[in-house]
Amino acid sequence: MSYFTDFVRGFLDLGATVILPVVIFLLGLFFRQKIGAAFRSGLTIGVAFVGIFLVIDLLVKNLGPAAQAMVKNLGVSLNVIDVGWPATSSIAWASSVAAFIIPLGIIVNVVLLVTKVTKTMNVDIWNFWHYTFTAAMVYAVSGSIWQALLAAVIFQVICLKVADWTAPMMSEFFDLPGVSIATGSTISYAPGIYLVKLLQRVPGLNKLDADPETIQKRFGAFGESIFVGLILGLGIGVLAGYKPGDIINLGMSMAAVMVLMPRMVKILMEGLMPVSESARTWLNKRFGEREIYIGLDAAVALGHPAVISTALILVPITVLLAVILPGNQVLPFGDLATIPFVVAFIVGAARGNIIHSVIVGTIMIAISLYIATDVAPIFTDMAKGTNVQMPKGSSEISSIDQGGNNVNYLIFKLFSLFN
């Protein structure tokens, strides 16, 4: 078993830029694409994800330190440190159940596709770590591998069904036809879609419109996404207490993210569409006319400027929430730069209305902080024995992403009732 576990971890360590091209190439062959066409699709998607993750790296490396400086300037002192998704995923893959999740997840997805329970073929294998973490939490309280695997399957099924539900949004708003998102962190904020719809019925608030197109019409060239990124970056730099040169550098970096990300997503779609069409043709021949979606990393939604704009505004709001919310013990840190991933569905439901997205995003993040506070004890216990080190000055750790994930939390609490 240890050899198999090492193989799985070694494969995952290759990252999405290697895993996805391989998976897409094999899928292309399976769906009767010619070898050259399948290879080109896989290679194009690999190149696109290299570009996407380079832009994300630019975002994280610049926004992360700025957010941390903001926390330091406010003199915030809380007992639980948000260690971020990299540490959380390490805890997940170090668990006793980790080796079973990927093969089980693939089997479950195939069965649900064949039985027409889902329309999503999720190739985002790397993000199976979300299911793995849920399984690890349940295993920690139950000691039962069967309960742990069942918990992972429940989370996966929920993710696939939400991915099906939101796929039309991905096509209509994000201009990503045939694509769905089943990433666990993004799925967690799907209830925010209902809050957006509720907000759109509130007199006064429903008249506030600040989507990128409206902003551009109102401010002309200065309303373009490149200028919005610059202004938001400069604002965060000021709040972080940066020197003038560093403020300008942060502004330029955020402007670059706004411009480059949509272009990387276009390259991704160039590689994905042939495979998606081949899959749809193959399935229609065997199972009748039906829609099929390719499940991808939530990073593809970051191509819309309203997502990045909303996330940048929510960074200082998240820090402020941590200070003023009674009972919260989590100090936002590692996951501040992952906010763009969790708000994607909210922004899509709001049709890019940044004001509505920020309001609903604030509510959802507040909920995440409370959940992350509640699971901090078991989160900390799970981290013991792994390579995750406790930050200095903290008694416990958690994360806003998976630790504050409401789907993960509900599943964990459900199984806790019986153990």
Question: Where would I find each of the regions flagged by the language model?
Answer:
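Membrane helical hairpin/interfacial module
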Residues: S41, I45-A99
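Cytosol-/stroma-facing membrane-proximal "stalk/adaptor" domains immediately downstream
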Residues: V360-V375
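Signature of multi-pass transmembrane helix bundles
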Residues: M1-V55, S96-Y293, L320, V343, ...
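Helix-loop-helix junctions within the multi-pass membrane cores of secondary transporters/permeases
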Residues: L20-V23, L63, Q68-T88, Q200, ...
